[in-house]
């Protein structure tokens, strides 16, 4: 406390001196002249006044001298003060200059240190990147080693590790640069997946047991038999090794693409699997693809699993061949999904799928059952010339955009119960070989069944048609049910106004199998008439006609 008091006192006491020195320095000449003149005046006038007052002698002389002494003393003190102030100022300037030079030196040293640090960091970055690229080159060489599967697998994991390193390098690279470096490696892995493997063509044979017979195939030549069996065993092992390597690549990709709700660390990469021959199962379930995905002309020899996958970028499966089952349950396509001219040899499951910009299934071949139940098509969707060899199920499917099924072929049952067609639904010249079920469906836009062929039964029970509905030129070969159907526009069974392209109803169906009793609340009814064939009376739509389905040239009304 005492020291603090002393410090405070010192600071306080120095302030007046500093102010006094500044004052003296500022007005030094004036003070000097003023004091000299004043002192001289006093030395002259005071003795003179004393003389007038009658005080004379040595007193006035002594007084004059004392005044001059005091004046000289004051002038001397002022000179000392000025000298001290000048010295202090010069010293302060010198210290300020020293401080300035010191700060400049420090700043230059700091800049030098920062520059050296930046240079070292750049060198470090270059070294790190050079080391990674060196490891990349080594890994590619390992991946190219056809003699040793273990070496190839090591190359795979080295590349995978490098991708993660690049992506984690936030301190050295921008996000765009990290993605660019990772994409290079992804391209290499995809290229490896796409590369042909000759033994894959014999996968079906090599996956089984050795079946050749010594006597029948080699005429008892034991040496040839043993050599062929050894070659089979060697090829079988090589195929399995390569299968494991490629499956591991897909497995690692999937683990970095999880999950479907949020993008994974590898989701932003483009994946090119075009023309790939997958001789092993593919599992991309729950994967999230944010960028483009290309499976054009790819062949899936075993199950392809895309369960609950999300495709935020372009997804192209055009001309892909799925030999076994393909599971797209719950998938989400943010952009238009392209399956044009693809083929599905097993079951194709798109149950609960979401197609936010529609889909193209033109000329697709579904050999197994195709399930699109509860699927949601937000934009226009095409099944033009699609072939359904198995059942085609669209239970509660939602087509919010235009839907095109023209010239499609359903070889087995076609089920559209409770489906919703938000805009135009076009089934022009579609062929339904077995049952066609539209019961409970709702057509909010125009519905065209122009020249459709219903070879078996067709069910429109409780179906709602909000706009124009055309059945002109359609063929009904089996039971036809329009019971409790609602039409908000008059249904057309022939072209107007000339009544050409009449709908045709087979005379081989039982009359009771034809039901045109629409709902009581339907604004429009199906106007009917009675027509007789060989003594059998049929009730058919007014503008329709009976025909013989066994006579392809029987276009005229019977």
Say what each PLM segment does.
Residues 3-5, 13-15, 21-22, 54-57, ...:
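Eukaryotic N-terminal accessory cofactor-binding modules
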Residues 125, 137-141, 147-153, 157-160, ...:
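N-terminal leader/targeting and pre-domain segments
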Residues 20-24, 72, 531:
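Extended hydrophobic/Leu-rich segments
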């Amino acid at each position: 406390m005492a020291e603090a008091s002393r410090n405070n006192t010192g600071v306080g006491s120095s302030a007046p001196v500093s102010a006094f020195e500044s004052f003296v320095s500022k007005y030094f000449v004036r003070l000097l002249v003023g004091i000299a003149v004043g002192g001289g005046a006093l030395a002259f006038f005071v003795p003179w006044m004393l003389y007038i007052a009658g005080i004379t002698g040595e007193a006035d002389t002594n007084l004059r001298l004392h005044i001059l002494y005091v004046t000289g003393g004051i002038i001397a003190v002022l000179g000392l003060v000025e000298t001290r102030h000048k010295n202090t100022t010069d010293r302060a300037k010198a210290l300020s200059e020293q401080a300035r030079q010191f700060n400049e030196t420090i700043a230059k040293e700091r800049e030098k240190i920062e520059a050296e640090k930046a240079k070292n960091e750049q060198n470090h970055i270059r070294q790190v990147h050079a080391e990674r690229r060196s490891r990349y080159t080594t890994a590619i060489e390992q991946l190219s080693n056809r003699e040793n599967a273990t070496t190839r697998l090591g190359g795979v994991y080295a590349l995978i590790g490098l991708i993660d390193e690049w992506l984690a390098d936030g301190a050295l690279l921008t996000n765009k640069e990290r993605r660019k470096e990772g994409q290079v490696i992804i391209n290499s892995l995809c290229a490896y997946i796409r590369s042909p493997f000759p033994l894959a063509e014999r996968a079906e044979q090599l996956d089984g047991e050795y079946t050749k017979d010594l006597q029948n195939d080699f005429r008892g030549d034991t040496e040839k038999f043993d050599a062929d069996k050894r070659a089979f065993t060697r090829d079988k092992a090589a195929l399995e090794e390569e299968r494991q390597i490629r499956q591991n690549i897909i497995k690692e990709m999937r683990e970095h693409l999880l999950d479907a709700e949020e993008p994974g660390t590898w989701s932003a990469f483009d994946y090119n699997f075009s023309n790939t021959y997958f001789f092993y199962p593919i599992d991309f379930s729950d994967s999230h693809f944010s960028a483009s995905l290309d499976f054009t002309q790819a062949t899936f020899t075993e199950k392809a699993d895309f369960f609950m996958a999300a495709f935020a970028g372009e997804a192209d499966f055009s001309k892909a061949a799925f030999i076994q089952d393909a599971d797209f349950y719950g998938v989400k396509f943010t952009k238009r999904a392209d399956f044009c001219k693809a083929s599905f040899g097993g079951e194709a499951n798109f149950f609960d799928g979401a197609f936010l910009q529609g889909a193209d299934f033109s000329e697709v071949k579904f050999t197994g059952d195709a399930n699109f139940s509860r699927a949601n098509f937000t934009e226009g969707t095409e099944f033009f010339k699609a072939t359904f060899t198995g059942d085609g199920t669209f239970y509660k499917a939602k087509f919010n955009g235009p839907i095109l099924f023209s010239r499609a072929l359903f070889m087995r049952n076609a089920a559209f119960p409770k489906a919703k067609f938000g805009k135009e639904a076009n089934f022009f010249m579609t062929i339904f070989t077995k049952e066609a079920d539209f019961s409970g469906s709702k057509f909010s836009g125009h519905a065209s069944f122009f020249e459709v062929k219903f070879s078996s039964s067709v069910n429109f029970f409780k179906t709602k048609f909000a706009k124009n509905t055309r059945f002109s030129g359609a063929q009904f070969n089996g039971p036809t049910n329009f019971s409790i159907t609602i039409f908000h526009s008059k249904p057309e069974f022939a072209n107007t106004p000339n009544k050409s392209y009449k709908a045709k109803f087979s005379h081989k169906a039982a009359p009771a199998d034809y039901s045109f009793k629409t709902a009581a609340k339907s604004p429009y009814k199906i106007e009917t008439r009675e027509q007789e064939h060989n003594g059998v009376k049929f009730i058919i739509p007014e503008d329709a006609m009976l025909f013989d389905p066994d006579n392809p040239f029987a276009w005229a009304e019977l």
